């Protein structure tokens, strides 16, 4: 389950996790950023990865990467998916990064679902000057969600909701 949006992604993941845990469904969680420790980004079977597990994953990724350029977020995401491959029966709750279209988390061919939390004007400065508007943010966050069932949370305006519906339909 991919969670995209501007605000509410982490709390949505925590709510989904609580619901699935109550139903005895095992989950993996990938979030960003972290608050206290990088380990909190990685949860498998209700447990954060410990330092040794994380270091081992980083070493494996570094070895496989062959000194190719890679961002910090791509390393973390690769570590998550590498570990998640050991828990294939679990549901993955994945918080996307800044935008979804070119995000490192956007590698799955299908999703059980995608959840669009509230969309806002944060991160406009990451867009080209002539594209700094809410429609472009919506496009960047939702245009690649066409491979799954899409759930749209209540938005701050009808215009945003309508724009999301237009892009994902």
Residue ranges, per PLM feature:
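Short beta->alpha junction loops/turns
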Residues: 6, 47, 98, 156-157
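Hydrophobic (often cysteine-bearing) scaffold residues that line and stabilize catalytic clefts
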Residues: 12, 73, 160
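Glycine- and other small-residue-rich loops at beta-strand/loop junctions that grip anionic moieties
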Residues: 5, 73, 153-155
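Acidic, Mg2+-coordinating active-site environments of NTP-dependent enzymes
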Residues: 67, 87-95, 111-169
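Walker A (P-loop) phosphate-binding motif
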Residues: 1-35, 40, 113-115
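Aromatic/hydrophobic pocket-lining residues that form π-stacking "cages" and hydrophobic walls in ligand
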Residues: 16, 80, 164-165
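ATP-dependent carboxylate-amine ligase catalytic core
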Residues: 22-109, 121-132
């Amino acid at each position: 389950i991919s969670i995209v949006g501007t605000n509410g992604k982490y709390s949505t993941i925590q709510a989904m996790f609580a619901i699935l845990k109550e139903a005895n469904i095992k989950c993996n969680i990938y979030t960003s950023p972290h608050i206290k420790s990088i380990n909190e980004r990685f949860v498998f079977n209700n447990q954060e990865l410990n330092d040794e597990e994380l270091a081992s994953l980083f070493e494996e990724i570094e070895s496989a990467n062959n000194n190719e350029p890679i961002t910090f977020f791509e390393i973390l995401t690769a570590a998550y998916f590498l570990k998640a491959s050991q828990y294939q029966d679990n549901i993955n709750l994945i918080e996307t990064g800044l935008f979804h279209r070119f995000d490192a988390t956007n590698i799955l061919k299908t999703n059980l679902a995608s959840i669009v939390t509230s969309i806002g004007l944060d991160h406009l400065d990451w867009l080209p000057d002539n594209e700094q508007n809410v429609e472009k943010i919506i496009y960047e966050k939702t245009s690649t969600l066409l491979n799954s069932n899409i759930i749209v949370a209540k938005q701050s305006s009808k215009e945003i909701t309508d724009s999301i519906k237009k892009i994902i339909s």
